[in-house]
Each structure stands twice: as C-alpha cells, then as structure tokens.
UniProtKB/Swiss-Prot annotation:
Encoding gene (name): prsA1
Coarse class of the protein's main subcellular location: membrane
This protein's GO CC annotations: plasma membrane
InterPro entries: Foldase_PrsA, PPIase_dom_sf, PPIase_PpiC, PrsA_foldase, Trigger_fact/SurA_dom_sf
Name the record gives this protein: Foldase protein PrsA 1
Length: 298
C-alpha cells in the first residue's frame, strides 16, 4: 500500500509550489536556490511524489464530494479532538508538525475520503449480518475504579444492601480513583461496540447488564478493579432497526482497510480525468490508473 494513502488517512502533509520558475526561495553565500531548482529536486524524491499524489487526490475528492462535507462537520471533529486532549492539544499538534489550519485540512480530507468510500463500496446483506453479530447500541454506565480487590469487595458489600443509582453515586465519590468521573458518580460518556477507550473485558461486562444492574464481581482491567452499573441500555433489538448504524460501522472499518482504500482511490482517480504534464512524473499514479477491481464489504 502506498504511504500516501496512509498519510491521507493519518497525518496530512501540506505542500505548495507557486508557479515554478526563477523566483528565489533561498539564498546562501554559495548562491541562490530558485523555485525551478527546488521543484526539480523535490519531484525526484519519494516524499515529493507522495505530496503530489495527495494534492491530485484531494483535488478530485474535493470536486466529487466537496458539497457533502461541510465546515460544520470539520469543526465538530476538530472540537472533539480538542476536548479529548484538553490543555495538551496545542502541544500534540506541534509534535505532529500540524497547525490548527493544517489539522482541519487533514480532517476535511478524511471526511472527503470517507464520502468516496460510502459512494464506491457496496455493502452487502452478508456484511450487515456479520457486523450485526458484534453490534451493541450505545449504552450509558457509571463505574467505580479501585486499586485493590479488598476495596472492591467493600463496595460490592455496600451495593448488596442498596444497589440504587443514588448509593452507587455516593460510593463512587467516596472510593473511586477515577478523578475524572468520581464527582459525577462515575458516569461515563455513552459508548457502543466500536469503543477503543475501554478494555474488551470492561465492554463485555457492561453490555451484559440491563438497566439498574451492576457487576456482582469486580472486573479486573489494566486500570485496577472496576464495578460497573448500567444506567441506560436500550437493548439490541432487531437488525432492521439499526441498518444505518451498521453501515456507519462498516464504513469506519473500511477507512482502516488498505485494500479497500486502494480500490476506492483507484476508482476516484480513474474518474478524475487526471493528466500528468511533467514527463518525469507521468507514471506517478500508474499503479492506480492501470488496474480495476470491484469494491464491496461482504
């Protein structure tokens, strides 16, 4: 898989050349470097070619799917990441060589690519049924995290006497070591089966609970011992009621599948009327323009 595809779905590289010519981009005691010299040097490198590939794909994606991706969507994703990293957000951007502007460009490119995936990949009934097996709707729980099993046993003994939400909240404030949630009674943001923040043990235990139920034994995770109480579990219901969610999960999985992405990008570029004017770069997209294959999630 070409690195540029991975970069597009991960860290977007930005690169601009303003009419390559005699304009000086740098000067030294040994002479000056012109735009044309810089261009000639860059186009022979793998990174230079990757950037051009990205620029071409972005142009075609923007034309085909630009109207489907709004500034509001980009801003929403940006704010989600900003909230996730909190005060360290600016540092994280800087460490990855990104600014607010370039990060938003990255997010927009990912959203455009996802629209292409949704357009080019056919989701079969078989794929929906397969995704349904692991599907769980969004649930809301509260938890109590402690470091020692003895403490967990003490909490469980208290819950045997009173398993109400009010008492669980009281116990979370008293015993939980999760400083982020304890003051809110250990309440966590809603999550479904695609969540990667919690361990598989935690998720498995949580999804088994009905409203008002709690884990009668502590769940051992890498964080410690956790007691989970279900606040809201709508139940899995029928597959036909969750088709939209299932498709979304499949498309999200496709965004991490290099084979699917390569097929999608190939189709996008073939329909983009791409013409490479520089003979030295004429084969830059050959691996994508010379083959054809069907894309489907099955």
């Amino acid at each position: 898989m070409k690195k540029w595809l991975i970069a597009l779905a991960g860290v977007l590289l930005t690169f601009t050349l303003a009419g390559c010519g005699s304009k000086t981009v740098a000067s030294t005691s040994g002479g000056k470097i012109t735009e044309s010299q810089y261009y000639s040097s860059m186009k022979g490198t793998s990174s230079g070619k990757q950037v051009l590939q990205q620029m071409i794909l972005n142009k075609v994606l923007e034309k085909d799917y630009g109207s489907k991706v709004s500034t509001k969507q980009v801003t929403k994703q940006y704010n989600t990441y900003k909230s996730q990293y909190g005060s360290s957000f600016s540092t994280v951007l800087s460490q990855n060589g990104l600014t607010t502007k370039t990060f938003k460009e990255q997010l927009r490119s990912n959203l455009l690519l996802k629209e292409a995936v949704k357009d080019k990949v056919k989701i079969t009934d078989k794929a929906l049924k397969k995704q349904w097996k692991s599907y769980e709707p969004k649930v809301t729980v509260q938890h109590i995290l402690v470091a020692k099993s003895a403490t967990a046993d003490k909490v469980l003994d208290a819950l045997k006497k009173d398993s109400s939400q009010a008492n669980f909240t009281k116990l979370a404030k008293k015993y939980s070591t999760d400083t982020t949630t304890k003051n809110d009674g250990g309440k966590l943001s809603a999550f479904d089966n695609t969540n990667t923040s919690y361990s598989s043990k935690f998720l498995t235990a949580a999804f088994k609970l009905k409203n008002g139920e709690y884990t009668t034994s502590a769940v051992k995770t890498s964080n410690g011992y956790e007691i989970i109480r279900m606040i809201k579990n709508p139940g899995k219901g029928k597959m036909s009621d969750h088709t939209a969610d299932l498709k979304k999960q499949i498309w999200d999985n496709d965004m991490s599948d290099s084979t699917v992405l390569q097929n999608v990008v190939s189709k996008v570029l073939k329909g983009g009327n791409v013409s490479i004017k520089d003979n030295d770069l004429k084969d830059i997209l050959s691996s994508y323009l010379s083959t054809s294959s069907s894309s489907s999630s099955n």
